[in-house]
């Protein structure tokens, strides 16, 4: 009987690997070049966000949400402020809702541009990130013009948004959409028909519908399996039920499908943005952008100069903060990476008793072993790129 040398390797992927999307360490067990087991070691970016939020007032806890999925910060803020508003029973004025939806969709573009182009870079294409980041830069400037910050915005507040948008900014966002769609078409023509990109992504990381549900997938990962599950349609929040848009779904549930869905989602986001811009410039041109309940939303500076009550409200809000009625609430939004949920438990004080953040990337990373098993080592990077992971939210 001939002697066969079986070469079993254990290798470390990361935590400083350029394709690891942050501080991910994966211990891979290989048989030759075939992956037999993947063990993701997470927690290298753990900052104790949930516990920190429990020591702060509701207003002070807001900025922590920006630091989770820092690619699309306002989408995480959205879930938190909706949860606080649900506890308080506060209604956000229509103009405030439209501004929130507009910036949530800008966040979706920011996220998908980064993911699609870096997914291409992970398999060897170097041009897409340069093209994609040019568009991201323009969107970052919209963030900056709305609230002064490019990344950690803290723009969504309980009761509405921090400040109104100037009309010229809304017009500029409207003028951005058509050139963006042209640029997206160029990116599409560059990557989608590319032979090498297809060979690296088609039939890689396939997952069935039942497996996807069982593993807690959401967002693009579940839609890739052919399920039209999108919280903006199935459990509408804000004014998404008044918007016209389609939900792209996949057929083969592989990495290539997930890429195609993200590309189409960007077009749908642009469609939603256009509807928001049109309404903000016509029917909802005037009106408040946040609730007028001064016990929750701080009064305007001009009001404080001649009203003692306004001054008192302002002082109380920024020292003690508002109290929420006791109870518990779970609110989920369709973040770019999937279902981002915030579970709040209130004990009637000015601070949350317990905050639980449900990060979509956390559930998706746990499936890495299942998705990669039996594939080649080089496919692990393609699969990791397609599940869209940011470590701020995975490790929290």
Curated annotation (Swiss-Prot):
Pfam family, one: Complex1_49kDa
Annotated membrane topology: Peripheral membrane protein
GO molecular function, one term: quinone binding
Keyword Cell membrane (UniProt): yes
Source superkingdom: Bacteria
Keyword annotations of the record: Cell inner membrane, Cell membrane, Membrane, NAD, Quinone, Translocase, Transport, Ubiquinone
Location (main, coarse): membrane
UniProt-annotated location(s): Cell inner membrane
InterPro entries attached to this UniProt entry: NADH_Q_OxRdtase_suD (IPR001135), NADH_UbQ_OxRdtase_49kDa_CS (IPR014029), NDH1_su_D/H (IPR022885), NiFe-Hase_large (IPR029014)
GO CC terms in record: plasma membrane
Gene3D superfamilies linked: Cytochrome-c3 Hydrogenase, chain B
Cystines in this chain: none
The protein's Enzyme Commission number: 7.1.1.-
Reaction(s) catalysed by this chain's protein: a quinone + NADH + 5 H(+)(in) = a quinol + NAD(+) + 4 H(+)(out)
Family affiliation: Belongs to the complex I 49 kDa subunit family.
Function: NDH-1 shuttles electrons from NADH, via FMN and iron-sulfur (Fe-S) centers, to quinones in the respiratory chain. The immediate electron acceptor for the enzyme in this species is believed to be ubiquinone. Couples the redox reaction to proton translocation (for every two electrons transferred, four hydrogen ions are translocated across the cytoplasmic membrane), and thus conserves the redox energy in a proton gradient.
Subunit composition and interactions: NDH-1 is composed of 14 different subunits. Subunits NuoB, C, D, E, F, and G constitute the peripheral sector of the complex.
NCBIfam families assigned: NuoD, PRK06075.1
Protein name in the entry: NADH-quinone oxidoreductase subunit D
């Amino acid at each position: 009987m001939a002697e066969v040398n079986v070469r079993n390797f254990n290798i470390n992927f990361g935590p400083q690997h350029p394709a690891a999307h942050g501080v991910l360490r994966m211990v891979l067990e290989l048989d030759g070049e075939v992956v037999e087991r993947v063990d993701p070691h997470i927690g290298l970016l753990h900052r104790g966000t949930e516990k920190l939020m429990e020591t702060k007032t509701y207003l002070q806890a807001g900025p922590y949400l920006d630091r989770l999925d820092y690619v699309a910060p306002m989408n995480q803020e959205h879930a938190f402020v909706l949860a606080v508003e649900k506890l308080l029973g506060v209604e956000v004025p229509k103009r405030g809702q439209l501004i929130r939806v507009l910036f949530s969709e800008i966040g979706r573009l920011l996220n998908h541009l980064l993911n699609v182009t870096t997914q291409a870079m992970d398999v060897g294409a170097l041009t897409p990130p340069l093209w994609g980041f040019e568009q991201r830069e323009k969107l970052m400037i919209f963030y900056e013009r709305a609230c002064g910050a490019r990344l950690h915005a803290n723009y969504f507040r309980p009761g509405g948004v921090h400040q109104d948008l100037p009309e010229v900014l809304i017009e500029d966002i409207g003028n951005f959409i058509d050139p963006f769609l042209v640029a997206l078409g160029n990116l599409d023509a560059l990557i989608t028909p590319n032979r090498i990109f297809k060979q690296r992504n088609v039939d890689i990381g396939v997952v069935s519908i039942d497996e996807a549900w069982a593993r807690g997938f959401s967002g693009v990962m579940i839609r890739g399996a052919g399920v039209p599950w999108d919280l903006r349609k199935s459990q509408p929040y804000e004014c998404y039920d008044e918007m016209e848009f389609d939900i792209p779904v996949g057929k083969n549930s592989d990495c290539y499908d997930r890429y195609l869905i993200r590309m189409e989602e960007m077009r749908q986001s642009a469609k939603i943005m256009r509807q928001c811009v049109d309404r903000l410039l016509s029917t909802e041109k005037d009106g408040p952008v946040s609730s007028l309940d001064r016990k929750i939303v701080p009064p305007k500076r001009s009001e404080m100069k001649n009203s003692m009550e306004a001054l008192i409200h302002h002082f109380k809000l920024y020292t003690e903060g508002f109290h929420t009625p006791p109870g518990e609430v779970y609110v989920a939004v369709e973040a770019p990476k999937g279902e981002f949920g915030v579970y709040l438990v209130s004990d009637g004080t000015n601070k949350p008793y317990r905050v639980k953040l449900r990060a979509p990337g956390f559930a998706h990373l746990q499936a890495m072993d299942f998705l990669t098993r039996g594939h080649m080592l080089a496919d692990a990077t393609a699969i990791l790129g397609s599940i869209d992971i940011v470590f701020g939210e995975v490790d929290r």
